[in-house]
Structures are given as C-alpha cells and as structure tokens.
C-alpha cells in the first residue's frame, strides 16, 4: 500500500513536467512579455517607491538628489551624476555632511549596538573561560598533591587532621587499687543500724 500513492505522485509529476502541448507554450510566452503601456508604467510609474541606490534601474531613471545623497551617503561621483556640473557639485560637496573632511554625522545606532553587544559578550565569555581554567587548574593541583602524598614523595609539614589530646589514664585494676595508698584508703564508717529514723 505504501508504494502505490508514491508511484501515483511520481507519475503525476513527470506527466506535468513532460507535457509539451503547443497551447501551453503559447500561454507561457504571453505571460513573460508585457505590452508597451504596462512596461512603460513599470519603468516610470508612481506605484514604485525609490529604493535609494539599491538596484532600482538608475541608468533608466533620472538622478534624484534626495535619493542619491540625502537618504544615504553618496560619493563624489554620485553627486556629480545628479548635478552634471563641476561648480554646482563643488558647492554642494562643501556643505555636504559626509564629504570626507569631517563634520558632524549621524550616529550609526545599529553598528553601535552590535559593537557594544559583541564587546560585552566577549568580556563575559573571557571571564567564564578564565574562571573555568582556574577552577580546573586548582582541582588538578589538588589531585596531584594528594597523589604525591600517597606515594610518600611529599610529607606535609602540618598534618591534615589535628591530633587529639592524649586520653587520660583509665581506672586502675583491682590489684593496682589495693596496692596503692592514698587519701581515700580508710575503711568506711561503721553503720549503726540498717533502719532509717522516722
């Protein structure tokens, strides 16, 4: 069952691609080419928005100062293309903000944001890398130190565990207690009666 639907799809795809009827070719040719009024409306129509120096058929459309130099930075050649006169171009170029002589230009916010973000990210990554390196190095040095102590090559000056104070001597045995003389060697006092007074 799985093979039959896929075979049907392959057959339909090949039949569509290999269809060479003359009626179909004529319709495709008519769809590609436009009539003269439609082509003219594409080139100079008001529906198109100028795209400021981005593939907008500049060779066929007249130069526009706003599009060429005010919306974007332009070069001397683009300004010369608009003015078509060296004296007018010189006058404009002296007052133009981005003329290469300095001047106050606008801040490129996108470039500034990308630069700051990448700088901060670089600092954070460098900090994390340094932290990881130091942590790994400290762990490795501790591991080497314990291995050397176990083999007896390094004897620590101060013991790792503090020594407990010596235990007090335990109680003497019965024989030792009888042999020793001391303050408490006297026999107990005699008991007068086993009864308690009421």
UniProtKB/Swiss-Prot annotation:
This is Transmembrane gamma-carboxyglutamic acid protein 2. The chain crosses the membrane at residues 112-132. Its main location: membrane. The gene is Prrg2. It comes from Mus musculus. Residues 133-198 are cytoplasmic. It comes from the Eukaryota. Residues 52-111 are extracellular. Residues 156-198 are annotated as: Disordered. Disulfide bonds join 69-74. Changing residue 191 to A: No effect on interaction with NEDD4. It is found in: Cell membrane. Gamma-carboxyglutamate residues are formed by vitamin K dependent carboxylation. These residues are essential for the binding of calcium.
């Amino acid at each position: 069952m799985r093979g039959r639907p896929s075979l049907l799809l392959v057959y339909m795809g090949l039949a569509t691609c290999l269809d060479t009827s003359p009626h179909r070719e004529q319709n495709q040719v008519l769809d590609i080419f436009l009539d003269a009024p439609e082509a003219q409306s594409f080139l100079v129509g008001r529906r198109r928005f100028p795209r400021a120096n981005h593939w907008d058929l500049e060779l066929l459309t007249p130069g526009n100062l706003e599009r060429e130099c005010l919306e974007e930075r332009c070069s001397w050649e683009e300004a010369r293309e608009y003015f078509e006169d060296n004296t007018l171009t010189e006058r404009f170029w002296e007052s133009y903000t981005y003329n290469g002589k300095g001047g106050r230009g606008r801040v490129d916010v996108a470039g500034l944001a990308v630069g700051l973000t990448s700088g901060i990210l670089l600092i954070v990554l460098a900090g994390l890398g340094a932290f990881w390196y130091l942590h790994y190095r400290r762990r490795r040095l501790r591991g080497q130190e314990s291995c050397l102590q176990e083999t007896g090559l390094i004897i620590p000056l101060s013991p790792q565990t503090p020594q407990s104070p010596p235990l007090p001597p335990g109680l003497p045995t019965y024989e030792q207690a009888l042999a020793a003389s001391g303050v408490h060697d006297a026999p107990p006092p005699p008991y007068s009666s086993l009864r308690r007074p009421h």
